[in-house]
Amino acid sequence: FLIVRQSDGGLKCYPNACLHRGRMLKEFDGRASEIRCAFHGFAWELDGCLKDVPARWDFPQIEDEEFSLPEIPLATWAGFVFINPNQNCEPFEPFIEELAGQFERWDLGSLYIQAHVARIVPCNWKIAQEAFCEAYHVNATHPQILRSLGDTNSQIDVWENCARVITPGGTPSPLLDYDLSDEDMLRAMMDVPDEADLPPIPEGMNARAYLAAMSREGLRADAGDRVDLYCDAEIVDSIDYTQWPNFHP
């Protein structure tokens, strides 16, 4: 699909296929003053209206009004762009309202992408997807973090269009058969070896609260005082949302 910025700042989406012979109209991101097919030269304005047909006399059957690029339903939320090839899809607002309600305090629209990272995983996509919808696998797959992650204490919420899993950090796994001190948990969370010095935990604080306080101050330089709006769970816990098919943990 093509997502095209309009002169008024809005967005439109079109199938990335020429209406003449189906060739891909654009092969990469960029800037352009028109949408021109590299095969035979058919061209459209950025608003989707037909602009040019080379040797137009050979196409008397084409009516300009009926040869615009078909628009795909498009909506935006918090800086994200959503499209749906189904012209009869459900309205966007009720589709996103459950997820949007979870992020009312986060002002996602003011954020920017600092880095884009991609990795190809040699597995069925559903396996990778499901692995991030639970923490049950931590005991066997990531045993090194059991001292600081309450894997089987996860809370899983399922709504109509989205789901959430919250796995508490700064607390040991219930599967461990031994007790941990706050210092043990802090070492595990900060990856500090036993022989190395550890910052003392302030009186009246446990390891979880201390880690949240340190993390909050570490984020302050980039995020500003908004970090004071976030509770310890939002700072320390693993909170993963799935909005099918748009967002994945």
Locate predicted features:
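Rieske [2Fe-2S] iron-sulfur-binding domain
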Residues: F1-R105
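C-terminal catalytic domain of Rieske-type non-heme iron oxygenases
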Residues: A75, F80-P249
